[in-house]
Protein backbone atom coordinates (compact mmCIF):
# COMPACT_ATOMS: atom_id res chain seq x y z
CA UNK A 1 0.00 0.00 0.00
CA UNK A 2 2.81 2.48 0.64
CA UNK A 3 3.86 1.99 -3.01
CA UNK A 4 0.41 3.27 -3.98
CA UNK A 5 0.71 6.19 -1.59
CA UNK A 6 -2.04 4.80 0.65
CA UNK A 7 -2.14 4.41 4.38
CA UNK A 8 -3.61 1.17 5.74
CA UNK A 9 -5.73 3.38 7.99
CA UNK A 10 -7.40 5.23 5.10
CA UNK A 11 -10.70 3.99 3.65
CA UNK A 12 -8.99 3.14 0.35
CA UNK A 13 -6.11 1.41 2.14
CA UNK A 14 -8.44 -0.68 4.28
CA UNK A 15 -10.51 -1.64 1.23
CA UNK A 16 -7.54 -2.59 -0.92
CA UNK A 17 -5.97 -4.58 1.93
CA UNK A 18 -9.23 -6.51 2.48
CA UNK A 19 -9.72 -7.05 -1.26
CA UNK A 20 -6.23 -8.45 -1.84
CA UNK A 21 -6.43 -10.70 1.23
CA UNK A 22 -9.80 -12.09 0.17
CA UNK A 23 -8.73 -12.45 -3.46
CA UNK A 24 -5.69 -14.46 -2.39
CA UNK A 25 -7.86 -16.78 -0.28
CA UNK A 26 -10.40 -17.19 -3.09
CA UNK A 27 -7.66 -17.95 -5.62
CA UNK A 28 -6.14 -20.60 -3.34
CA UNK A 29 -9.53 -22.31 -2.92
CA UNK A 30 -10.21 -22.20 -6.68
CA UNK A 31 -6.76 -23.52 -7.60
CA UNK A 32 -6.80 -26.34 -5.04
CA UNK A 33 -10.36 -27.24 -6.04
CA UNK A 34 -9.25 -27.49 -9.67
CA UNK A 35 -6.15 -29.53 -8.75
CA UNK A 36 -8.48 -31.92 -6.91
CA UNK A 37 -10.35 -32.43 -10.18
CA UNK A 38 -13.44 -30.50 -9.09
CA UNK A 39 -15.29 -27.80 -11.01
CA UNK A 40 -16.37 -24.44 -9.61
CA UNK A 41 -19.89 -25.88 -9.69
CA UNK A 42 -18.91 -28.07 -6.72
CA UNK A 43 -18.27 -24.83 -4.78
CA UNK A 44 -21.77 -23.49 -5.54
CA UNK A 45 -20.32 -20.97 -7.98
CA UNK A 46 -23.16 -21.57 -10.41
CA UNK A 47 -26.37 -20.07 -11.67
CA UNK A 48 -28.72 -22.10 -9.49
CA UNK A 49 -32.03 -20.36 -8.84
CA UNK A 50 -30.51 -17.01 -9.75
CA UNK A 51 -33.74 -14.96 -9.60
CA UNK A 52 -34.57 -16.03 -6.04
CA UNK A 53 -30.93 -15.82 -4.99
CA UNK A 54 -30.44 -12.27 -6.24
CA UNK A 55 -33.86 -11.09 -5.04
CA UNK A 56 -33.25 -12.20 -1.45
CA UNK A 57 -29.66 -10.93 -1.49
CA UNK A 58 -30.51 -7.54 -2.96
CA UNK A 59 -33.53 -6.98 -0.69
CA UNK A 60 -31.32 -7.71 2.35
CA UNK A 61 -28.66 -5.35 1.00
CA UNK A 62 -31.18 -2.52 0.46
CA UNK A 63 -32.82 -2.98 3.89
CA UNK A 64 -29.49 -3.08 5.72
CA UNK A 65 -28.16 -0.10 3.76
CA UNK A 66 -31.20 1.91 4.82
CA UNK A 67 -30.59 0.90 8.45
CA UNK A 68 -26.79 1.16 8.43
CA UNK A 69 -26.52 4.18 10.75
CA UNK A 70 -28.63 2.89 13.68
CA UNK A 71 -27.20 -0.64 13.33
CA UNK A 72 -23.63 0.67 13.32
CA UNK A 73 -24.30 2.82 16.37
CA UNK A 74 -26.08 0.02 18.24
CA UNK A 75 -23.81 -2.95 17.50
CA UNK A 76 -20.48 -1.63 16.19
CA UNK A 77 -19.57 1.34 18.37
CA UNK A 78 -20.44 3.92 15.68
CA UNK A 79 -20.52 7.51 16.96
CA UNK A 80 -21.97 10.70 15.46
CA UNK A 81 -22.82 9.11 12.12
CA UNK A 82 -24.74 10.83 9.33
CA UNK A 83 -25.24 10.13 5.64
CA UNK A 84 -23.03 13.11 4.78
CA UNK A 85 -20.26 11.63 6.88
CA UNK A 86 -20.46 8.07 5.55
CA UNK A 87 -21.18 8.70 1.84
CA UNK A 88 -17.48 9.20 0.92
CA UNK A 89 -16.70 5.81 2.50
CA UNK A 90 -19.42 3.86 0.69
CA UNK A 91 -17.42 2.83 -2.42
CA UNK A 92 -14.58 1.58 -0.20
CA UNK A 93 -16.99 -0.07 2.23
CA UNK A 94 -18.63 -1.91 -0.68
CA UNK A 95 -15.24 -3.23 -1.82
CA UNK A 96 -14.54 -4.45 1.71
CA UNK A 97 -17.90 -6.04 2.45
CA UNK A 98 -18.33 -7.69 -0.96
CA UNK A 99 -14.77 -9.06 -0.88
CA UNK A 100 -15.18 -10.39 2.64
CA UNK A 101 -18.64 -11.84 1.95
CA UNK A 102 -17.45 -13.62 -1.21
CA UNK A 103 -14.45 -15.09 0.61
CA UNK A 104 -16.34 -16.22 3.72
CA UNK A 105 -19.29 -17.66 1.79
CA UNK A 106 -16.91 -19.61 -0.45
CA UNK A 107 -14.88 -20.93 2.47
CA UNK A 108 -17.67 -21.68 4.93
CA UNK A 109 -20.46 -22.69 2.57
CA UNK A 110 -19.09 -23.33 -0.91
CA UNK A 111 -16.40 -25.72 0.27
CA UNK A 112 -18.49 -27.72 2.71
CA UNK A 113 -22.21 -27.81 1.90
CA UNK A 114 -22.02 -30.12 -1.12
CA UNK A 115 -19.60 -32.46 0.60
CA UNK A 116 -21.50 -32.70 3.91
CA UNK A 117 -25.13 -32.78 2.76
CA UNK A 118 -25.08 -36.36 1.43
CA UNK A 119 -23.95 -37.57 4.86
CA UNK A 120 -25.61 -35.16 7.29
CA UNK A 121 -28.68 -33.86 5.47
CA UNK A 122 -29.55 -30.20 4.90
CA UNK A 123 -30.32 -29.08 8.45
CA UNK A 124 -27.31 -30.71 10.14
CA UNK A 125 -25.03 -29.41 7.38
CA UNK A 126 -26.41 -25.93 7.97
CA UNK A 127 -25.67 -26.17 11.72
CA UNK A 128 -22.23 -27.77 11.23
CA UNK A 129 -21.11 -25.04 8.82
CA UNK A 130 -22.60 -22.27 10.98
CA UNK A 131 -20.72 -23.15 14.18
CA UNK A 132 -17.17 -22.58 12.83
CA UNK A 133 -18.36 -19.49 10.96
CA UNK A 134 -19.66 -17.91 14.17
CA UNK A 135 -16.61 -19.00 16.19
CA UNK A 136 -14.32 -17.54 13.51
CA UNK A 137 -15.74 -14.12 14.38
CA UNK A 138 -15.11 -14.48 18.12
CA UNK A 139 -12.60 -12.16 19.70
CA UNK A 140 -13.24 -9.20 17.44
CA UNK A 141 -13.26 -5.72 18.87
CA UNK A 142 -15.69 -3.98 16.55
CA UNK A 143 -18.92 -4.55 18.43
CA UNK A 144 -20.27 -3.43 21.74
CA UNK A 145 -21.96 -6.60 23.06
CA UNK A 146 -20.55 -9.97 22.00
CA UNK A 147 -23.50 -12.01 23.26
CA UNK A 148 -26.03 -9.99 21.30
CA UNK A 149 -23.82 -10.03 18.22
CA UNK A 150 -23.10 -13.76 18.20
CA UNK A 151 -26.27 -15.33 19.54
CA UNK A 152 -28.97 -12.94 18.42
CA UNK A 153 -27.45 -11.66 15.19
CA UNK A 154 -24.63 -13.71 13.65
CA UNK A 155 -25.94 -17.19 14.48
CA UNK A 156 -29.37 -16.75 12.83
CA UNK A 157 -27.85 -14.82 9.92
CA UNK A 158 -25.33 -17.57 9.28
CA UNK A 159 -28.11 -20.16 9.35
CA UNK A 160 -30.05 -17.99 6.86
CA UNK A 161 -27.06 -17.64 4.51
CA UNK A 162 -26.54 -21.39 4.49
CA UNK A 163 -30.26 -22.00 3.94
CA UNK A 164 -30.23 -19.54 1.02
CA UNK A 165 -27.27 -21.33 -0.57
CA UNK A 166 -29.05 -24.67 -0.16
CA UNK A 167 -32.40 -23.33 -1.39
CA UNK A 168 -31.01 -21.58 -4.47
CA UNK A 169 -28.17 -24.02 -5.18
CA UNK A 170 -25.85 -21.01 -5.54
CA UNK A 171 -23.62 -18.70 -3.47
CA UNK A 172 -24.67 -15.44 -5.17
CA UNK A 173 -27.61 -14.55 -2.94
CA UNK A 174 -25.81 -15.50 0.26
CA UNK A 175 -22.84 -13.35 -0.77
CA UNK A 176 -25.11 -10.31 -1.21
CA UNK A 177 -27.10 -11.12 1.95
CA UNK A 178 -23.83 -11.56 3.89
CA UNK A 179 -22.51 -8.28 2.50
CA UNK A 180 -25.65 -6.61 3.84
Region annotations inferred by a language model:
Residues 60-180:
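Transmembrane helix-loop-helix hairpins at the membrane interface
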Amino acid sequence: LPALGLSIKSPAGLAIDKFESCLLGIMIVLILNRLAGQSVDSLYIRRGRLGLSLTVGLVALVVMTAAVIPITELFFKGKDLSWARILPWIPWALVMILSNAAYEELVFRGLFIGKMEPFLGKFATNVVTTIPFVLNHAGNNYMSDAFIFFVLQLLPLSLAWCWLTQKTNSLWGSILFHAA
